[in-house]
Every structure is written in structure tokens, then in C-alpha cells.
Amino acid sequence: MTKVLLGFMGVGKTTVSKHLSMHCKDMDAIIEAKIGMSIAAFFEQHGEIAFRTIENQVLKDLLFANDNSVIVTGGGVVVLQENRQLLRKNHQHNILLVASFETLYQRLKHDKKSQRPLFLKYSKEAFYEFYQQRMVFYEGLSDLVIRVDHRTPEEVANIIEGY
């Protein structure tokens, strides 16, 4: 069965996936290859709704492949109800990576390489509310929750591989 990594933006899903011996499929990388530009540029030019439509199709394709890989999702994959339904069908194989809000906020604030449109849009207080809303979805879909605040990516990868 395909495992799915879930978690808020900046939690380290892509970083952890680089330490897994299992075959990983990074949805953001797949989407960027498909659209021919960065996700940030696509958001700016076409908006979030257009992006979520593409994200939904990529998630469907990857889940239906059912090839025992690890799907590394983007932080907003839980926004669409259809995506949440797809993820519920993957029951017992959804893994949530969790970090404290302050850890995530500092990571995103200092990440000059990957400017995330939804992070740049909010004040810290509004971003916290956004974070709390998303966490409700993640927690409702997750079968294994891994706190990453005080773990290395290698340690997190070992937990995932043992699951």
C-alpha cells in the first residue's frame, strides 16, 4: 500500500523523504514539471483554485498507481474535500509530520529559497489561525503522527520505514 506523508508547509516532508530508502514521489516536484513553472509563479498567474485542481489530479494518479511508494504531499493537499476523501481511502497509511507552530513559522520566515505564497499573505496571528484550521484536517486523516521538533530527518525516516 502507498504511504502518504502529510503535514503543514515547512514541516520537512521533502527533506525527510530524501532519507527514505523507499521510492518517493514528491507531488510539488511532479506538479512543477507538469505546469512548467514554480508553484509560487503558478499561484500568482492562475490562482489557488487552478492549482488545487491540478494537485487533485496528481494525487488521484499517484494513489491509484498503488505501487508501494511514498507520496510526499504539499501542505495544502487537505484543502479540497475530494482530496480528503481520497486520503481517507488510504486508511492506515497516512503519516503526519508535526512541528510546533513557532518552529514552522521560523523555518518559513527564514527560507529565502522557497517563498510560499500562502505564508507571505498572512500576518503571524492570521497565519496561526490558518495553521490551526489545517491541523484539524491533517489530524483527522492521519494514522501515525510523528513529532519532528527534536528529531533529525534521518530519525523521522527510520520511524516511517518501520511503520
Swiss-Prot record:
The keyword Transmembrane does not apply. Pathway: Metabolic intermediate biosynthesis; chorismate biosynthesis; chorismate from D-erythrose 4-phosphate and phosphoenolpyruvate: step 5/7. Binds 1 Mg(2+) ion per subunit. Its EC number is 2.7.1.71. Mg(2+) binds at residue 14. It catalyses: shikimate + ATP = 3-phosphoshikimate + ADP + H(+). CDD domains: SK (cd00464). GO terms for cellular component: cytosol. One of its GO terms (biological process) is amino acid biosynthetic process. ATP binds at residues 10-15, 116, 151. One of its GO terms (molecular function) is ATP binding. The keyword Plastid does not apply. Substrate binds at residues 28, 52, 75, 134. Disulfide bonds: none annotated. Keywords: Amino-acid biosynthesis, Aromatic amino acid biosynthesis, ATP-binding, Cytoplasm, Kinase, Magnesium, Metal-binding, Nucleotide-binding, Transferase. It is found in: Cytoplasm. Its cofactor is Mg(2+). InterPro entries: P-loop_NTPase, Shikimate/glucono_kinase, Shikimate_kinase/TSH1. PANTHER family: SHIKIMATE KINASE, SHIKIMATE KINASE 1, CHLOROPLASTIC. Belongs to the shikimate kinase family. Catalyzes the specific phosphorylation of the 3-hydroxyl group of shikimic acid using ATP as a cosubstrate. HAMAP family: Shikimate_kinase (MF_00109). Monomer. This is Shikimate kinase. It comes from Streptococcus pyogenes serotype M5 (strain Manfredo).
